[in-house]
């Protein structure tokens, strides 16, 4: 492993990419400590701790604070991080599955992807502006102590909205530069850095919680099993053999090759969990606004009804998103169009039904896995009775991005005849 890292720095291009990525991440981490203008930082720290202890929103705040790398707890210019961009990307991907014009745009090659990326940035600006205004205004209005002396709520809202929106767009630009000049996907790297930066605070929470030896062993075992399970499921796929018919033109023979169609167990990544988290938080938000104690207790984070609805939503969205990004009808049509077929099946309807059946079976495993990952923090907290946010979702993102980084570094090193991180086999990057 250490020899592989040494080899990586022997390749000038790879060394420059690694250094650029580290410098970009330093800039990202510095920005997290810059508060928005007009904020009473000390008062906000007390307010955040008080809100985080509220039964209905504790899990939601912890989940979001992990994604922002702790920026929310500091109410910094990077408070929204790249979440508006992720939301915009998901919305446009879903629209592309039902709007022929967007679907055709994605099929136009590089130019189409550039146009799609431009639409994503515009939607990010719109969503980011609305989100920044809503967060700034609602928090300042309900907690006027967080506003610095001499600044009214309206002034703070304007300053905070502009600062957070500028922070999001800067991170979007920084992520694109990392993709272009660094290692891995820039947006994923920023989220990865934010998640990993929170791990020391998790360990500190566990230490201050006074865990005994047995509870420490349980906590470490859960973490190791979770990481192993994530790697296993992230890499798992069902391969369907595709055979292409041979064509003879003159003295040349075309086709006749055999390949495979991969169907990943976890097609949607963390997107089903993000969708489910957004929906399941609505009753808690309504309860907080209306101050309805019955609704607060009913949909308390970690309560039976909350976990039941959360789990069912994750299960549903896993199937829903799998069908969106892997359309059996479209794929069977493409196989037939290019002269391919699945051995033992007729092209067309039979192939489509077979792909649909395999997709359902494979997705079931992925859906059960994501439900366990989503509910893991609440199950661990219930077992050891300590408020330690061991997030399966954050681990899923961190491990996925780490695998992608290793795969890219491996490719650079193998191309230049250096021994990589893996001596046998090959890690597949996320698609």
From Swiss-Prot:
Residues 74-77, 78-84, 85-95 dip into the membrane without crossing it. One of its GO terms (biological process) is SRP-dependent cotranslational protein targeting to membrane, translocation. Pfam families: SecY. Gene3D superfamilies: SecY subunit domain. GO terms for cellular component: cell envelope Sec protein transport complex; plasma membrane. The chain crosses the membrane at residues 18-32, 74-95, 121-133, 162-178, 183-198, 214-226, 271-283, 303-315, 368-382, 390-403. Keywords: Cell inner membrane, Cell membrane, Membrane, Protein transport, Translocation, Transmembrane, Transmembrane helix, Transport. It is a multi-pass membrane protein. The central subunit of the protein translocation channel SecYEG. Consists of two halves formed by TMs 1-5 and 6-10. These two domains form a lateral gate at the front which open onto the bilayer between TMs 2 and 7, and are clamped together by SecE at the back. The channel is closed by both a pore ring composed of hydrophobic SecY resides and a short helix (helix 2A) on the extracellular side of the membrane which forms a plug. The plug probably moves laterally to allow the channel to open. The ring and the pore may move independently. NCBIfam families: 3a0501s007. Belongs to the SecY/SEC61-alpha family. This is Protein translocase subunit SecY. It comes from Thermotoga maritima (strain ATCC 43589 / DSM 3109 / JCM 10099 / NBRC 100826 / MSB8).
């Amino acid at each position: 492993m250490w020899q592989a890292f040494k080899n990586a720095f022997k390749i000038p291009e790879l060394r420059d990419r690694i250094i650029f990525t580290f410098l970009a991440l330093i800039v990202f981490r510095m920005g997290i400590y810059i508060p928005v203008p007009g904020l009473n930082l000390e008062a906000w720290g007390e307010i955040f701790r008080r809100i985080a202890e509220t039964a209905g929103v504790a899990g939601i705040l912890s989940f979001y604070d992990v994604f922002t790398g702790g920026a929310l707890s500091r109410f910094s210019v990077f408070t929204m991080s790249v979440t508006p961009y992720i939301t915009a990307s998901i919305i446009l991907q879903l629209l592309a599955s039902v709007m022929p014009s967007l679907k055709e745009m994605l099929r136009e090659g590089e130019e189409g992807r550039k146009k799609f990326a431009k639409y994503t940035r515009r939607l990010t600006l719109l969503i980011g502006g609305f989100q920044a205004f809503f967060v700034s205004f609602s928090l300042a209005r309900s907690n006027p102590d967080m506003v610095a002396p001499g600044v009214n709520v309206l002034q703070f809202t304007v300053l905070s909205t502009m600062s957070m929106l500028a922070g999001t767009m800067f991170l979007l630009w920084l992520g694109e530069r990392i993709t272009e000049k660094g290692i891995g996907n820039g947006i994923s790297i920023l989220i990865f850095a934010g998640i990993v930066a929170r791990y020391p605070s998790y360990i500190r929470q566990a230490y201050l919680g006074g865990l005994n030896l047995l509870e420490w062993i349980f906590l470490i075992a859960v973490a190791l099993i979770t990481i192993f399970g994530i790697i296993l499921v992230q890499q798992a796929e069902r391969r369907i053999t595709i055979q292409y018919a041979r064509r003879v033109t003159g003295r040349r023979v075309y086709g006749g090759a055999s390949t495979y169609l991969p169907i990943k167990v976890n097609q949607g990544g963390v997107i089903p969990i993000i969708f489910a988290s957004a929906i399941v938080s609505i009753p808690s938000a309504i309860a907080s606004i209306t101050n309805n104690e019955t609704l607060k207790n009913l949909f308390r984070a970690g309560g039976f009804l909350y976990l039941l609805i959360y789990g069912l939503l994750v299960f549903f969205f896993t199937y829903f998103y799998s069908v969106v990004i892997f359309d059996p009808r479209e794929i069977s049509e493409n196989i037939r169009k290019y002269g391919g077929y699945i051995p033992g099946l007729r092209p067309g309807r039979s192939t489509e039904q077979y792909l649909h059946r395999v997709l359902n079976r494979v997705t079931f495993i992925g859906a059960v896995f994501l439900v366990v990952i989503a509910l893991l923090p609440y199950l661990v907290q219930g077992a050891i009775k300590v408020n330690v946010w061991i997030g399966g979702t954050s681990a899923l993102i961190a491990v996925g991005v780490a695998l992608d980084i290793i795969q890219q570094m491996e490719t650079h090193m193998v191309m230049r005849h250096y021994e990589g991180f893996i001596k046998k086999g090959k890690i597949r990057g996320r698609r």
